From Swiss-Prot:
Keyword field contains Nuclease: yes
One annotated Gene Ontology cellular component of this protein: cytosol
Source species of the chain: Clostridium tetani (strain Massachusetts / E88)
HAMAP family recorded: Nuclease_YqgF
Gene3D superfamilies: YqgF/RNase H-like domain
CDD domains for this protein: YqgF
Protein name, per record: Putative pre-16S rRNA nuclease
NCBIfam families: RNAse_H_YqgF (TIGR00250)
One example GO MF annotation: nuclease activity
Length: 138
């Protein structure tokens, strides 16, 4: 059972995938957004390639737990994605995942240019790994 992790942004979508046992998350790619149809097609292709059963998408919340405008955009995108792909989509709190991704890359001595290219993919890994850890640590 493979699970896809998404970090949906305005310009890019970070993508991660679980191992077949659902224990660990690995980065797949960062999709440069063009239009809704192409974005969904790219995600669909990845789902087919990895035989994905469900999707976990990061839900951007404010630090006080409330939902803001970006949360609405992500939820709207995921609602459309769910209809198109007919897969379960779990919304997962993504607070501080991008901060954690940046911190890990800085500690790894990656240049700013390299960090910019992969930060969303790394954030998707954090989102998916957080979900996987919650499922298997019950």
């Amino acid at each position: 059972m493979r699970i896809l992790g998404l970090d949906v942004g305005d310009r890019t979508i970070g993508v991660a995938i679980s191992d077949p046992l659902g224990w660990t998350a690995q980065g797949v790619k960062t999709i440069k957004r063009s239009n809704l149809k192409n974005d969904i097609k790219e995600i669909e292709d990845i789902c087919n390639e990895y035989k994905v059963d469900k999707i976990v998408s990061g839900l951007p919340k404010n630090m006080n737990g409330t939902l803001g405008p970006q949360s609405e955009k992500v939820t709207e995108f995921c609602d459309i994605l769910k209809k198109e792909l007919e897969k379960e989509i779990i919304m997962w709190d993504e607070r501080l995942t991008t901060v954690a991704a940046h911190k890990a890359m800085i500690e790894g001595d990656l240049s700013r240019a390299k960090r910019k290219k992969i930060v969303d993919k790394i954030a998707a890994i954090y989102i998916l790994q957080g979900y996987l850890d919650s499922v298997y640590n019950k």
